[in-house]
């Protein structure tokens, strides 16, 4: 039941994101989904900074097309959103692994 509340809370908070963040969100979630597999660097104890930057760059390359003045601010937003999402997924991954083992 706690997991349901966590998910509802998270979904609500995403629903009140500013417009720019809402436009970035699908690209960020798609990239995180793509990286979510056993052995992925996103589950490493200390994910490689270069790989994280490359991941964010792939998101930026898609998201910048929708912005009038993309730039460093957009990359900063993408990095913050992506790292937050990775933290959430890493916690979920650990909790699932605890239940299995």
Where in this protein do the model-derived segments appear?
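Short, small-residue-biased leader/transition segments that mark boundaries at the very start
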Residues: 1-5
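Residue-level signal for alpha-helical context at structural boundaries
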Residues: 42, 46, 96, 100-101
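Membrane-proximal topogenic or attachment-prone low-complexity segments at protein termini
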Residues: 6-69
């Amino acid at each position: 039941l706690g997991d349901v509340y966590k998910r509802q809370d998270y979904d609500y908070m995403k629903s009140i994101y500013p417009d720019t963040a809402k436009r970035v969100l699908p690209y960020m979630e798609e990239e995180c989904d793509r990286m979510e597999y056993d052995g992925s660097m996103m589950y490493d104890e200390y994910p490689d900074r270069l790989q994280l930057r490359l991941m964010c760059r792939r998101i930026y390359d898609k998201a910048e097309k929708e912005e009038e003045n993309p730039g460093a601010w957009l990359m900063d937003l993408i990095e913050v959103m992506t790292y937050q999402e990775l933290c959430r997924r890493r916690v979920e991954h650990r909790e699932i692994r605890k239940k299995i083992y």
